[in-house]
Regions:
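Mixed-charge interfacial surface used for oligomerization/domain docking
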Residues: 1, 37, 46-66, 72-204
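N-terminal glycine-rich anion-binding loop in soluble enzyme alpha/beta folds
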Residues: 1-23
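Alpha-helix boundary/capping residues
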Residues: 8-12, 31, 104, 124
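Short secondary-structure transition/capping motifs
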Residues: 13-20, 42-46, 73
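N-terminal glycine-rich phosphate/adenylate-binding segment common to multiple enzyme folds
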Residues: 23-51
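Single conserved hydrophobic/aromatic residue that forms the stacking wall/gate
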Residues: 202-205, 209-212
């Protein structure tokens, strides 16, 4: 992981790709030798074609493979795995696990900020002109993922303001969107910055939750 971020910081050319259908089917076939069913939780169908591919491939497996389309990615996708394990331990079938996870797909929210606008420009999410202006003015976009879409949430100046904006957004979600299930929510964090920087932000995030 550290090597990846070193290359990213060194301006190396990095791209992503979904796994090939052959690799997916090989893995499923190996798992079904020892297990009766599979719950597959791919990243959000709105952000990758991996989910659509898995859904298509699963049609040849007589419902032994249940593909969950619950619009999750990153830390919320990871939490879906933990939720699936808990449901399995409660005796739920693969189909029942899929139904529960998809029913709860909107009970998640992600806020993201980036240190460089390079990859948003490269991916076509902002224009080269906007990227140039944003870099000069030290503008940090805060992006939001709720459901299948990655949307602009705010545009602020500086890293500190971006972190504060995300913490405020988390607090608002817990008091508004997730008020009825607030006690059941899980706070997660993914980062590429220094451990010292993330430790402070992680502490503030937990303080925000505990104050509610």
């Amino acid at each position: 992981q550290e090597q990846f971020y070193e290359k990213l910081g060194a301006d190396s050319e990095i791209s992503t790709s979904q796994p090939s259908p052959g690799d997916v089917m090989d893995l499923w076939d190996k798992l079904l030798v020892d297990y009766d069913e599979i719950v597959c939780i791919p990243m959000s169908s709105g952000l990758s074609s991996t989910c659509e591919t898995a859904l298509s491939l699963a049609q040849d497996y007589d419902e032994k493979v249940q593909v969950v389309n619950n619009q999750r990615i990153s830390v919320t996708q990871e939490q879906s795995v933990y939720d699936a394990i808990k449901l399995r331990d409660e005796g739920k079938s693969a189909a029942e696990i899929r139904q529960v996870l998809e029913k709860e797909k909107m009970q998640a929210s992600i806020y993201v900020t980036v240190d460089t606008l390079k990859y948003l420009k490269k991916g076509g999410r902002i224009t080269p002109a906007a990227a140039a202006i944003g870099t000069v003015l030290n503008l940090k976009p805060v992006l939001q993922i709720q459901g299948e879409k990655l949307d602009a949430f705010a545009k602020v100046r500086g890293w500190k303001a971006a972190k504060k904006t995300m913490l405020n957004a988390i607090e608002k979600d817990l008091t508004d969107r997730f008020a009825d299930v607030k006690d059941q929510m899980v706070l997660g964090m993914a980062y590429t910055c220094s451990k010292e920087a993330v430790s402070y932000t992680h502490l503030r995030a937990h303080e925000t939750v505990l104050d509610l």
